[in-house]
A protein has these predicted regions:
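N-terminal beta-strand motif that seeds the catalytic metal site of vicinal oxygen chelate
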Residues: 39, 93-119, 129-131, 162, ...
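Core segments of cupin and vicinal oxygen chelate
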Residues: 1-23, 108-148
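A short, glycine/Asx- and small/polar-enriched loop/turn
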Residues: 20-23, 33, 75-77, 143-149, ...
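Short beta->alpha transition motifs characteristic of CBS
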Residues: 81, 91-98, 197-198, 204, ...
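Short, flexible turn/loop "capping" segments at secondary-structure junctions
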Residues: 30-33, 99-102, 154-156
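Short, charged/polar, Gly/Pro-enriched secondary-structure boundary elements
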Residues: 25, 30-33, 88, 147-151, ...
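Vicinal oxygen chelate
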Residues: 40-86, 112-115, 163-209
Length: 221
C-alpha cells in the first residue's frame, strides 16, 4: 500500500526492508514481533487515502476503518485504516495541517502507565526533537517538526524501535546522559555504528515499557 502514498522502497533484503523513514525487520527469538502499534502515514489528498485503503483491502489485508471523516480528531481529519499481518494498525491520513516534510503523520503506542511514560518522553524529548503538547489521565501527546507521537493507556505496545534524528553527535550524547542519569535503562551507549553506514552515530535507551528509543546523527551532508 505504501506506493500509493508516494513511499518508494529505499532498501530491501531478506532481513530488512525500508521506505524512507519507516522500516520493517524480520522478527527473531532475540527480537520478537511488534504488537499493538498504530502508525499513520501522510496522504497528500483524500483520494490518496481512499487508494491506500482500497489497495490494502483488495490485497486481502484486514479493514480497520473505511476511509472517511473522523471529526473526533479534527474538523478536516480524513483517515482510512488497515491491519498488518501482525495486527498492527496502519492508517493513511489527510488533514489541512499535515506536514509536507515528513512521511509519518503520527505514531501511537499503548503503555501500562501514562504518567510514567510521559515522564520518560519529557526527559528525552528536548534531545529528540519533540515536546509535550497536551496530557490527560489516559493520553499524552508530543509534537515535533514533522508529526506527533502519543502514549495511550492500554495493553502495552511491544517491541517497538523508534529512532529520532539529531543535528550533531553532542545531541546524541546529551540524550543518553539525560535518560540514564534519570534512571532509565541503557540499551547502547553513544558511538559510531558502521554496520548501518559510515558516520552513523547513535545511542539507545529503553522506555518504561521496554521499547527501544534511539537518537541518531547520520553525519551526512
Amino acid at each position: 500500500m505504501l506506493p500509493t502514498l508516494g513511499l518508494a522502497k529505499t532498501h530491501g533484503d531478506e532481513h530488512f526492508v525500508e521506505w524512507d523513514d519507516f522500516s520493517l525487520a524480520q522478527a527473531s527469538d532475540r527480537k520478537p514481533v511488534t504488537r499493538r502499534l498504530h502508525i499513520a502515514f501522510v496522504a497528500p489528498s483524500r483520494t490518496v487515502v481512499d487508494e491506500f485503503w482500497r489497495a490494502g483491502t483488495d490485497s486481502g489485508y484486514r479493514d480497520d476503518g473505511a476511509p472517511g471523516p473522523r471529526p473526533k480528531y479534527g474538523d478536516d481529519y480524513y483517515g482510512g485504516f488497515l491491519l498488518d499481518p501482525d495486527g498492527n494498525s496502519a492508517e493513511a491520513v489527510h488533514h489541512d495541517s499535515v506536514s509536507e516534510r515528513g512521511r509519518i503523520d503520527h505514531l501511537w503506542i499503548r503503555v501500562a502507565d501514562v504518567e510514567a511514560a510521559k515522564r520518560f518522553y519529557e526527559t528525552v524529548g528536548p534531545h529528540a526533537g519533540f515536546g509535550l503538547r497536551r496530557a490527560t489521565d489516559d493520553r499524552a501527546q508530543f509534537v515535533g517538526q514533522t508529526g506527533s507521537f502519543s502514549v495511550v493507556a492500554g495493553t502495552p505496545t511491544e517491541q517497538v524501535h523508534m529512532a529520532f534524528p539529531a543535528p550533531d553527535n553532542g545531541t546524541v550524547e546529551r540524550f543518553h546522559r539525560a535518560a540514564t542519569e534519570a534512571g532509565y535503562r541503557d540499551n547502547g551507549a553513544p558511538g559510531e555504528r558502521p554496520v548501518y553506514h559510515a558516520g552513523y552515530y547513535s545511542a539507545f535507551v529503553l522506555d518504561p515499557d521496554g521499547n527501544n528509543v534511539e537518537v541518531v546523527n547520520h553525519n551526512r551532508d
